[in-house]
Design a protein with these regions (language model features):
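Transmembrane alpha-helical segments that form the membrane-embedded catalytic/substrate-channel core
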Residues: 53-82, 103-109
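Non-catalytic, topology-defining segments of multipass membrane proteins
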Residues: 1-69, 116-159
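Generic alpha-helical structural context detector
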Residues: 72, 98-101, 107, 133-137
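Short leucine-rich amphipathic alpha-helical surface patches
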Residues: 78, 103-104, 110-111, 117, ...
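Active-site-proximal inter-transmembrane loops
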Residues: 4-12, 80-106, 112-113
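Generic serine detector
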Residues: 48, 60, 73-75, 79, ...
Length: 159
C-alpha cells in the first residue's frame, strides 16, 4: 500500500492487505471444519475434514491459480485465440477459457478498452464476471459501471 496510495481510500483493501495470511488460514480452517462437522452430523456422507480441506481449499486454489495464470500466458500466445482489435501487445481473445475465467479470457477486448467493467463486448462472448458485477450493482455493492462505447465495438479489423 505504500506504493499505491489510492488503496488507503478503501478500508476493505487495507484490511485484506493487513491480514493477507490470516484470510487463507481461516478459509482453510473453515473448509476443514465443514468436513469435520459433516462427518459428525451426517456420517453416511463419508466426508472428512481432510477431504474438504483438500478439495475445497488446496485443489480449488491450485486450479484458480492455474486458470488465472493462463490469462497472462495463453491469452498472449500468437497461435491461440483471435485478435479483434489492434493493440500494442499480443493479447488474444480465447473463447474456450471464458467459462473457467468468468470472462477474463476476452483479453484482447480488455486491452483495447480497459476501462470497461465488461470484457465480453458482444452477447455471444460469455462474461460471467460482468453478470456478477451487475448483480452486485443491484444490491448497491458496485456502482459507476463503465460500458463499452459504440465506437469501440466496430473498429478497423486487425492485421
Amino acid at each position: 500500500t505504500e506504493l499505491i496510495k489510492d488503496f488507503a481510500k478503501y478500508p476493505e483493501l487495507m484490511f485484506l492487505d493487513r491480514f493477507d495470511t490470516v484470510i487463507p488460514i481461516l478459509y482453510g480452517a473453515t473448509m476443514f471444519f465443514i468436513g469435520y462437522f459433516a462427518n459428525m452430523f451426517f456420517p453416511e456422507l463419508g466426508t472428512s475434514g481432510a477431504q474438504t480441506l483438500v478439495w475445497g481449499y488446496v485443489l480449488s486454489t491450485v486450479f484458480l491459480y492455474h486458470v488465472t495464470f493462463c490469462i497472462n500466458s495463453v491469452s498472449h500466445v500468437d497461435s491461440v485465440g483471435n485478435r479483434r482489435y489492434e493493440t500494442t501487445d499480443h493479447s488474444r481473445n480465447v473463447w474456450w477459457l471464458s467459462a473457467l475465467t468468468f470472462g477474463e479470457s476476452w483479453h484482447n477486448n480488455h486491452h483495447y478498452f480497459p476501462a470497461s467493467s465488461r470484457l465480453g463486448f458482444f452477447w455471444w462472448e460469455l462474461d460471467l464476471g460482468y453478470y456478477v458485477i451487475r448483480t452486485m450493482k443491484l444490491f448497491g455493492l458496485a456502482w459507476d459501471l463503465k460500458g463499452v462505447p459504440e465506437r469501440y465495438l466496430h473498429p478497423q479489423p486487425s492485421a
